């Protein structure tokens, strides 16, 4: 896309929201059009750029998207499942594209998102990082070659404030591996182990979760056999990698027809 894409960021005062504001500031083809916080927040009325540490941007944090209807083309949302559904409904009614980085949606909410996406273009991904999306492609290859005869474990770690577990990225890793092997993740996933569990079933995919300190995000898939194991690992050291991916998705999604897309499509990996 040749011109600038105007973005609005909801949850602007959170850790990820501030990083998104900073990312928008540094990208030539992105213009921050609006920044939104919840009603009653002490941050309402503050300049978004000053909040994010990039200097004054003359974009004042507001408490409703209704005040910014004409100020943006794409809404970027890394908030919470219930809030993201409300924001997507708003985008459909106001003909705005949306980028969703929120994780933790239940099945009913995923069905809602699919229905809304029939009316407006939406990019939704549990992880916007280029490296993570490449990792998912590598997992397909590893599962094709080694998946049938190895024990598969997925280990993920995040900061102490993360609310959902396992992470959306870890679940996507499991889905990619299970699909490649012709398995149903809901039936073969094992989430943590305790007590006398008996011998491991090779058809299962194990998940282990770490929540500690300020870990940004670490994910490892292990394919373990007798005598050797393959580990595919991605480590994020800054939230900026997710924010930059979201900006890339925003530039891409404004040119798409209504539909539900993922970062694999944004990056041309599928």
Swiss-Prot record:
Pathway, per record: Amino-acid biosynthesis; L-lysine biosynthesis via DAP pathway; (S)-tetrahydrodipicolinate from L-aspartate: step 4/4
Subcellular location: Cytoplasm
Cited Gene3D superfamilies: Dihydrodipicolinate Reductase, domain 2, NAD(P)-binding Rossmann-like Domain
Binding locations of NAD(+): 11-16, 37, 101-103, 125-128
Binding site for (S)-2,3,4,5-tetrahydrodipicolinate: 159, 168-169
Record-listed E.C. numbers: 1.17.1.8
Catalytic activity: (S)-2,3,4,5-tetrahydrodipicolinate + NAD(+) + H2O = (2S,4S)-4-hydroxy-2,3,4,5-tetrahydrodipicolinate + NADH + H(+); (S)-2,3,4,5-tetrahydrodipicolinate + NADP(+) + H2O = (2S,4S)-4-hydroxy-2,3,4,5-tetrahydrodipicolinate + NADPH + H(+)
GO cellular component, as recorded: cytosol
EC top class, as a word: oxidoreductase
Binding site for NADP(+): 38
Keyword vocabulary terms for this entry: Amino-acid biosynthesis, Cytoplasm, Diaminopimelate biosynthesis, Lysine biosynthesis, NAD, NADP, Oxidoreductase
Location of the active site: 158 (proton donor/acceptor), 162 (proton donor)
InterPro entries documented for this protein: DapB_C, DapB_N, DapB_N_CS, DHDPR_bac, NAD(P)-bd_dom_sf
Keyword ATP-binding appears in the UniProt entry: no
GO biological process assignments: diaminopimelate biosynthetic process; lysine biosynthetic process via diaminopimelate
Keyword Signal: no
Record PROSITE patterns: DAPB (PS01298)
SUPFAM superfamilies recorded: Glyceraldehyde-3-phosphate dehydrogenase-like, C-terminal domain, NAD(P)-binding Rossmann-fold domains
Matches recorded under HAMAP family: DapB
Stated role: Catalyzes the conversion of 4-hydroxy-tetrahydrodipicolinate (HTPA) to tetrahydrodipicolinate.
Family affiliation: Belongs to the DapB family.
Protein name, UniProt field: 4-hydroxy-tetrahydrodipicolinate reductase
Organism: Shewanella sp. (strain W3-18-1)
